[in-house]
Amino acid sequence: MSSHRPQHRLSVPDIQRRKGAGSLVALTAYSTPMARLLDPHADLLLVGDSLGMVLYGMPSTLGVSLEMMVAHTLAVMRGSRRACVVADLPFASYQESPRQAFRNAARLLADSGAQAVKLEGGEEMEETVDFLVRRGIPVLAHIGLMPQQVNAMGGFKAQGRDPESAERVRRDGLAMQRGGAFAVVIEGVGEPLARRLSEELAIPCIGIGASPACDGQVLVSEDLLGLSGEQVPRFVERYARLDREIDEAARRFAEDVRERRFPEARHCFAMRE
């Protein structure tokens, strides 16, 4: 009998237990090849609606559909074995009512195999989060800078940098915890506020443009790989410049084709005798 054991996929309770027990690593993934590469290094793979901007060139995340989220989450599930996979509920798929949120969240999980959904919002979404969690759908909350509210916020602007705004974000975090979210993404807020929330909340706080004191960090993978162009948010660290490597590879290929150096004999199939 083979001694090989299937690799354990991290679960929602596994993520919850990481509060105060080492930093969580979260990365976005939208495809099978990227998920396969990131899976050994990430605790959470987030299939974010950011795919609308990153992959499809949309100006915001508002044009992403539930069908797109199902398809890309399926691709990530096929490429991963270890990480807990969380899929975003896209704009207008959950804000109308808790029942609408349940219907679409249930479809997203059932059709993709993901472990949890992520939704944006604070106090106004507490009832919805509670409704989902009580019916078996784990929720990762998202507070602070919320991309689906880009029009209401007047752009992608940092939040919680004045006392009034900070208190509003703090109340949002507490509301998401009361609603039963297993963790919360805190995006684009003042560092002292993110630090305070990480200390005050009993659930893991995952920062993006927040604070090193958070229980984990998440970045858009294309940003850290250098595939997002020259303009990136100030909180991004580029760990590679794959854009330059891709440009060089494409240049060399084009040159070899035009000079008839590619393909060579070793790339071609011989006739059978």
From Swiss-Prot:
Q: How does it assemble?
A: Homodecamer; pentamer of dimers.
Its job? Catalyzes the reversible reaction in which hydroxymethyl group from 5,10-methylenetetrahydrofolate is transferred onto alpha-ketoisovalerate to form ketopantoate.
Q: Which GO terms describe its biological process?
A: pantothenate biosynthetic process
**EC number(s) of the enzyme?**
2.1.2.11
Q: Does the keyword Coiled coil apply?
A: no
Residues involved in 3-methyl-2-oxobutanoate binding:
D49, S50, D88, K118
Task: Name it.
Answer: 3-methyl-2-oxobutanoate hydroxymethyltransferase 1
Going by the entry's taxonomy, the superkingdom of the source organism is recorded as Bacteria
Q: Which cofactor does it need?
A: Mg(2+)
What reaction gets catalysed by this protein?
Answer: 3-methyl-2-oxobutanoate + (6R)-5,10-methylene-5,6,7,8-tetrahydrofolate + H2O = 2-dehydropantoate + (6S)-5,6,7,8-tetrahydrofolate
Q: Name one GO molecular function term.
A: magnesium ion binding
Q: Which InterPro entries match?
A: Pantoate_hydroxy_MeTrfase, Pyrv/PenolPyrv_kinase-like_dom, Pyrv_kinase-like_dom_sf
Tell me where in or outside the cell this protein is found: Cytoplasm
Catalytic positions are E187 (proton acceptor)
Q: Which UniProt keywords apply?
A: Cytoplasm, Magnesium, Metal-binding, Pantothenate biosynthesis, Transferase
State the family it belongs to: Belongs to the PanB family.
Positions binding Mg(2+) in this chain are D49, D88, E120
Cofactor remark from the record: Binds 1 Mg(2+) ion per subunit.
**What GO CC annotations are associated with the protein?**
cytoplasm
Major subcellular site: cytoplasm
Named in its record, the pathway it takes part in is: Cofactor biosynthesis; (R)-pantothenate biosynthesis; (R)-pantoate from 3-methyl-2-oxobutanoate: step 1/2
